[in-house]
């Protein structure tokens, strides 16, 4: 082995250690991730050829090694104690008074405050700057040796940086899993059909206690330091906060929210600030930790039983509690989604009394295996809707019963559907369901549907709230006199609305189909249906097999269409609309052997049209057999360009696509 290989190995190790600190501690990377990965691969290659050169501080150990049969035990030289808790300002005041009373002649001036991370406490022992041991807290006296696993956590330096560190230094802190990493871990587990973790704390603990460190290496774990234990060979600062800064200078990350304050009132303000920002933080916390900053006063205060007298955890209101699931009700949302809602024995959680929690959908009920009567764990975080996160199955009563999804909508009685591959169950009575009424009516009168001037969202909401309309057909039964009872609706405005409704009765089949709000039937699909079947009766009677023959209609959309027209209540509204006078020009069938002018052509509209509205031009093109798209590509056959055409025209010219004018379109329409 040459000296150059050994020198390169040391260079790579030093560089990787340096850049890990820049990335994980200082949040200020100097090189791209790809360059870091390249150096790591080079290091792994050298060590693979020369395994005798692998040292305990090698960055290569972050990928994990051979599985252990069990964890060995570690006795803590300085006990790892837990903290007493405060749950309100009065208890915090009591902590401060007790501490102040014990140090007569000294004034406690400053406190060091930090978020209380919801993870796993660990001890890191460095000798001569190299990480030689990592252990869990265990019972405070004895923990488990998790050195191999901790070495895989990128945020923890295998070798200290800078200078001035003690020859033996024990750093204590919290291993945790950031929220984003937790979500991604569970998402991947669901895709693979594997068990998911209940919360980030369980995920962090489970990941850190793997006998196979390669599994730990694959988990998104991080670390923040919060104190020291053993210190030999150097003197640290006499301030808890300044010790944090020393530790950080040696390459160990500290929580960026850590702050030194000058009074108990500032401690309380810090607590409120962190509580307010809790949900926005990248990691889970369950309170704040408050420590006397002066180390000399810490030493005078000492410890009592299992906890220091100089520190306390000011806990947030609990985000999880246990209660009984008494019943399940099914609510229908504005789009027809049916959501199971757990009716709970009221419980105080997350700062409020909770009596309802979402169960999301049938898949979630199946995953939880929850039943009515179960003892369940409820979680409420910030403004998030409370949810059932787990079931205590060993407490299940004999009277517990299965939760069954309804076959009919609990609001309107229409059939419900659940498309294969979708989690949501929906009501099919979009035109009649009270829960969906406002959204259905707003869609019906929208510009791309019946296009009724004067019937904006606020008018629709008033009409529904006053129970003046139930279905779209009821709109055409309104008189100007009736409409004047609405807010900001004078006689003239009311007359204009009635006239607009009358005008909208003459429409087109594509617009009418679109106005019905059939799931996933947009403008293009409605146009394709009209062009293929030519009339409404044929569409209503079409089978799924026939519908799939239509351009751009697949199995799912075909199912939505047959389900919609298969619901008698929807059919009744359609017939009522026709009875109110809605009509459209007949779509002529093409003559035998004669193709439509733009049959099979893909076209794009761009620019300002002087004689046609954009929707009108689009409908005309579709009636001429064209497929209208929104962007120019190699598949585009014709670009119809109006005035002030911009980038689409330039791209069409570049691709050599045929370009026509608005007048060309008008000529085709004659």
Curated annotation (Swiss-Prot):
The active site is at 116 (n6-amp-lysine intermediate). NAD(+) binds at residues 33-37, 82-83, 114, 137, 174, 291, 315. The keyword DNA damage applies. GO terms for biological process: DNA repair; DNA replication. Its cofactor is Mg(2+); Mn(2+). One of its GO terms (cellular component) is cytosol. This is DNA ligase. It comes from Vibrio campbellii (strain ATCC BAA-1116).
């Amino acid at each position: 082995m040459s000296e150059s290989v050994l020198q390169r190995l040391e260079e790579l190790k030093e560089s990787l250690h340096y850049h890990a600190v820049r990335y994980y501690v200082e949040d200020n990377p100097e090189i791209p991730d790809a360059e870091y990965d390249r150096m790591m691969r080079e290091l792994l290659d050298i060590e693979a050829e020369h395994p005798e050169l692998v040292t305990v501080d090698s960055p290569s150990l972050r990928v994990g090694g051979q599985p252990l049969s069990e964890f060995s035990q570690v006795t803590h030289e300085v006990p790892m104690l837990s903290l007493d808790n405060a749950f309100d300002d009065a208890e915090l005041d009591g902590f401060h008074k007790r501490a102040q009373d014990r140090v007569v002649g000294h004034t406690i001036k400053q406190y060091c405050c930090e978020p209380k991370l919801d993870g796993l406490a660990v001890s890191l022992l460095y000798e001569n700057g190299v990480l030689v041991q990592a252990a869990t807290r265990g019972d405070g006296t004895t923990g488990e040796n998790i050195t191999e696993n901790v070495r895989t956590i990128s945020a923890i330096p295998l070798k200290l940086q800078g200078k001035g560190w003690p020859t033996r230094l024990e750093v204590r802190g919290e291993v945790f899993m950031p929220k984003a990493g937790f979500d991604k871990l569970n998402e991947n587990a669901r895709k693979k059909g594997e068990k998911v973790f209940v919360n980030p704390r369980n995920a962090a603990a489970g990941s850190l206690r793997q006998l196979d460190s390669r599994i730990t290496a694959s988990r998104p774990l991080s670390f923040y330091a919060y104190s020291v234990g053993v210190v030999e060979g150097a003197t640290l600062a006499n301030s808890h906060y300044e010790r944090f800064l020393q530790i950080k200078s040696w390459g160990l990350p500290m929580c960026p929210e850590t702050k030194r304050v000058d009074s108990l009132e500032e401690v309380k303000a810090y607590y409120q600030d962190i509580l307010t920002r809790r949900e926005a933080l990248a990691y889970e916390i369950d309170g704040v930790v408050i420590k006397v900053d002066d180390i000399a006063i810490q030493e005078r205060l000492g410890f009592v039983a299992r906890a220091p007298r100089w520190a306390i955890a000011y806990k947030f209101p609990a985000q999880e509690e246990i209660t009984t699931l008494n019943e399940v009700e099914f609510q229908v949302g504005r789009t027809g989604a049916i959501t199971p809602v757990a009716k709970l024995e009221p419980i105080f959680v997350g700062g409020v009394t909770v009596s309802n929690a979402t169960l999301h959908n049938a898949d979630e009920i199946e995953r939880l295996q929850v039943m009515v009567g179960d003892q369940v764990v409820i979680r409420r975080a910030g403004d998030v809707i409370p949810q059932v996160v787990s079931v205590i199955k060993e407490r299940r009563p004999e009277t517990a019963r299965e939760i069954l999804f309804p076959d009919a909508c609990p609001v309107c009685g229409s059939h419900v559907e659940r498309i294969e591959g979708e989690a949501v169950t929906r009501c099919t009575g979009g035109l009649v369901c009270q829960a969906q009424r406002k959204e259905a009516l707003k869609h019906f009168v929208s510009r791309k549907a019946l296009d009724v001037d004067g019937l904006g969202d606020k008018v629709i909401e008033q009409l529904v709230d006053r129970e003046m309309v139930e279905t779209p057909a009821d709109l055409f039964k309104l008189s100007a006199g009736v409409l004047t009872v609405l807010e900001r609706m004078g006689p003239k405005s009311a007359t204009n609305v009635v006239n607009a409704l009358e005008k909208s009765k003459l429409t087109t089949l594509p617009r009418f189909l679109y106005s019905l709000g059939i799931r996933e039937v947009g403008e293009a699909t409605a146009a394709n249906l009209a062009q293929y079947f030519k009339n409404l009766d044929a569409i209503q009677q079409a089978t799924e097999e026939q519908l799939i023959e239509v351009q751009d209609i697949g199995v799912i959309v075909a199912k939505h269409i047959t389900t919609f027209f298969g619901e008698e209540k929807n059919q009744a509204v359609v017939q009522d609309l026709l009875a109110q006078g809605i009509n459209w020009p007949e779509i002529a069938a093409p003559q035998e052997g004669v193709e439509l002018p733009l049959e099979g052509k893909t076209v794009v509209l761009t620019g300002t049209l002087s004689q046609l509205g954009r929707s009108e031009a689009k409908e005309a093109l579709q009636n001429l057999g064209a497929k209208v798209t929104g962007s120019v590509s190699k598949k585009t056959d014709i670009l119809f360009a109006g005035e002030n055409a911009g980038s689409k025209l330039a791209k069409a010219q570049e691709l050599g696509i045929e370009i026509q004018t608005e007048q060309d379109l008008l000529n085709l329409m004659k």
